[in-house]
Amino acid sequence: MNVRRSVRIVGPGRAGGAMARALADIGWQVLEPVDRSVDPTEVGLDVDLVLIATPDAAIAEVARAIEPSSTTVVAHLSGALGPDVLAPHPHRAAIHPLTSMPTADIGALRLRRSCWFALDAETPESMDCLESIVRDLGGRSFRVDESRRANYHAAAAIASNHVVALLGSAERVAADAGVPIEAYLELVRATIDNIEDLGVADALTGPVARGDWDTVARHRAAIDPSELELYDALVEATRRVVDSSTQRESSLPPRPTDS
């Protein structure tokens, strides 16, 4: 960086703490975090960027408490919200790191490992600030405007949070066979590798991809009834992936109707 930019973070929890550490590591001047003892009207003074890392429900209130500046960029880390929630700040923006940050330390490491970021900004100046963050962290970015923000974040929840829920189901079903979840994690990693190498449709394997409905029926007979609703929903979701692949669509046997 030719110019050392400065940032003040409001709400240094896991995400805010991770951003603070990652930005400090790459040479940004990270000012003291903001807590309740700080006059909120002074948060945006003498700083290039104010980064709001509070829960989504508090972002608008925090932004309104900060005195607007003609030079300071005010941004938030929410994936579901766009820059409009930061009105009346002229240089408002949203930057969402598309990674999981269970702790500040782990998050800081992941932010510097070719992380993807979803960006949106109200002005060229605020977009330039966001792009400098991505560039300095060695990341990659794409723009998601206000109207598509919820779609984007729903996909992120499916790709991350829902995977954890799926593995929770796998863990419970595996326990009935006396098998630990750790035995399945290499399978999970191999599946992610297949998706990266081949794309979603061509990465798919297993009984639904083969049209092996007898095996699906054996699964349904074996697993605990409390898991059936999720299992059936996933079978149908898997069928949709198969149906979207022109290579398999013509040869896939139809699923028998339930009697």
PLM region spans:
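Hydrophobic anchor at the start of a short beta-strand
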Residues: V7, V30-L31, R92, S141, ...
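NAD(P)+-binding Rossmann beta1-loop-alpha1 motif at the extreme N-terminus of oxidoreductases
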Residues: M1-L45
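Hydrophobic Val/Ile/Leu positions in short beta-strands of Rossmann-like dinucleotide-binding domains
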Residues: V7-I9, I52, L119
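NAD(P)-dependent Rossmann-like dehydrogenase/reductase catalytic/cofactor-binding core
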Residues: E182-S259
